[in-house]
């Protein structure tokens, strides 16, 4: 098995390369907050030498409650993304939920994300593939790791091979997620880059009745475990005031802890990838 390398400007994304950080905020709350968070991430990752892609959503279309904040929408969101990109010289990742969003989003954003709940929607997959953008596929909470090959095939047959696979936890009974570390290793066997979403894996879906709960206190432990597998990337969201974030605050890393957190993740990644592989199947 060979590791596929995805090139994003000067950044190389592969399971045997130094990890790439996909990070930012859950949803765009305001232009000023987005700029603040992007600046912090940019400064910290540059200091630590971590390749970095800014993440935020312009629309959270799958909130638990119809009254929950969704975001500024695509038009305003893309304006904010353009400003972040030009100000900080950062590549961008965001998610789409509908076919008509794919082409305009791909004109601004470098990586388009396929949400976990929509990962089997063929029309959306085809529309995303045809943009030619790099694709980040969130593994649905209800699919086994080996079933991700079917989604890969859909993208391939639609003409796109620039695919990353993202683990974000699996359903474990009601209102709970667990992370199958061996499942991430199984996804690595496809050769495609595997990303670990250590933020959303902390969710307790519907755990607060009309919104998701989370286990922010365990953010470090979960991410350390994932990084020990030798992955292509880490996906995290942070907020300067998680308790008052408009979406997924219970899972968000406090922004002031970002540097210490990433320092540990980089140390683990560097160590694990310095080891010679051991084939215990023989």
UniProtKB/Swiss-Prot annotation:
It is found in: Cytoplasm. The keyword Transcription regulation does not apply. Keywords: Cytoplasm, Lipopolysaccharide biosynthesis, Transferase. InterPro entries: Aldolase_TIM, DAHP1/KDSA, KDO8P_synthase. Pfam families: DAHP_synth_1 (PF00793). Its EC number is 2.5.1.55. GO terms for molecular function: 3-deoxy-8-phosphooctulonate synthase activity. Its main location: cytoplasm. GO terms for biological process: keto-3-deoxy-D-manno-octulosonic acid biosynthetic process. Belongs to the KdsA family. This is 2-dehydro-3-deoxyphosphooctonate aldolase. The lineage of its organism: Bacteria, Pseudomonadati, Pseudomonadota, Gammaproteobacteria, Alteromonadales. The gene is kdsA.
